[in-house]
Amino acid sequence: MLIQFTVENHRSIKNSAVISFAASKDKSFEEYLLHPDEKKVLLPVLAIYGANAAGKSNVLHAMMTMKEMVVGNAAKVSKGQKLPWEPFGGTKVPTSFEMVFIFQGVRYTYGFSFDAKKIYKEYLYHWPNGREALIFSRENGVYEFRENVNEQVTLSNRTPDNKLYLVSSNDWNLPQTENAYQWFLEKLTFLMDEEPATSETVAQIVSGDDKKARILKELMLADLGITDVTIKNTSCLLYTSPSPRDMRRSR
């Protein structure tokens, strides 16, 4: 269960931006709120509002990048391989991600900062008995451990500067970091198309019914200055290159 996500210095996001599922004191629709324990009250859903080019999609992109670095292709980096770093305006300072979540009844806080070449900072805390406890922290190559220290020291020595310790420790089946890793793998999911559904949108415009009206309304709300959209069919000549066999026959 996601509680909070924080991103700083990613794409159009310069300063710290926070998505929080923590509920306010408003009692409206209280029956729909989530209660993971006696103290926490969370929202079941939230929406991100903002003007065009305000960075809404980049917040989601930051979450996807964080997951990609933990359980995706970017987690499989070799020593010296570049990380997916996209800082604001070409700045040189590291990008930071942090995720707060609950998995199997335990609260976790995991975060890291990085640039294209290395991980500068990384940390994982949990609250197994309602009290904060450090699993590991890492800053400029210096690690700190409070649990299973000897094994973690060995694993940290095997972790290159450009790889997350959460990833490498799970490669070696460290039990202390397994649950946090599994949350990213199993629970953090994204339901969105990577490419725009152009053909579907065109079909809705051609239909000319309520679907087109809805599209025009969305364009109006976006304040793009577009009042109508029409589809025009045009004919064109399609040229295909002859196959090598056809070229031999024509000689």
Where are these regions (language model features)?
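Extreme N-terminal starter segment of soluble prokaryotic enzymes
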Residues: 2-3
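Single conserved hydrophobic/aromatic residue that forms the stacking wall/gate
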Residues: 239-251
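Electropositive, glycine-dotted interaction segments
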Residues: 109-237
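Short acidic, glycine-rich loop/turn motifs
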Residues: 7, 101-103, 126
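Conserved RecA-like P-loop NTPase ATPase core
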Residues: 9, 52, 59, 219
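Conserved P-loop NTP-binding catalytic core
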Residues: 34-41, 45-47, 51, 57-119
